[in-house]
Amino acid sequence: MLELFQFEDCPYCQKVRRKLEELDLSYLSHPSPSGSVKREFLGRFVGELQFPLLVDPEKNIFMFESDDICAYLEKTYGPSKVKSER
């Protein structure tokens, strides 16, 4: 399952959440507000503290940058991809 590390008020995170909803993709949300344990862990684990962060464990992908994430989601899970798999 896709995982999204994000925080509520971030416009870049909102953009990715909208794309996930538009494509009707299930994902696990990891809210990571300032001062949270998840945010601290993420900085140590990934070595970078940038949001949003999309993790696609099936494809071993860790991705920052909302535009890159949205393009990846569209290319990998977009409507044409879903229809061809049915």
Model-predicted regions and their roles:
Residues 1-8, 14-86:
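GST-like domain detector, emphasizing the conserved glutathione-binding G-site
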